[in-house]
From Swiss-Prot:
Residue numbers spanned by region Disordered: 1-26
Biological-process GO terms, alphabetical: translation
Keyword set, alphabetical order: Ribonucleoprotein, Ribosomal protein
Bias kind Basic residues: ranges: 7-16
InterPro entries per the UniProt record, alphabetical: Ribosomal_bL32, Ribosomal_bL32_bact, Ribosomal_zn-bd
Protein name: Large ribosomal subunit protein bL32
Keyword Ribonucleoprotein assigned: yes
Family: Belongs to the bacterial ribosomal protein bL32 family.
């Protein structure tokens, strides 16, 4: 098993963890229906970038 040779400082630990934060989901409002959806994803009623792409 690997064992560290020297103790990592709080600063180095914090620098490593600085990239671990989660970002919030990017939301957009659809131009045609006004529905809120995730960016680069089809809305629930089948629109993407103002065009109907899924027929239900």
């Amino acid at each position: 098993m690997a064992v560290q040779q020297n103790k990592k400082s709080r600063s180095k630990r914090g620098m490593r963890r600085s990239h671990d934060a989660l970002s919030t989901a990017q939301l957009s409002v659809d131009a045609t229906s006004g529905e809120i959806h995730m960016r680069h994803n089809v809305t629930a009623d089948g629109f993407y970038r103002g065009k109907k792409v899924i027929n239900k």
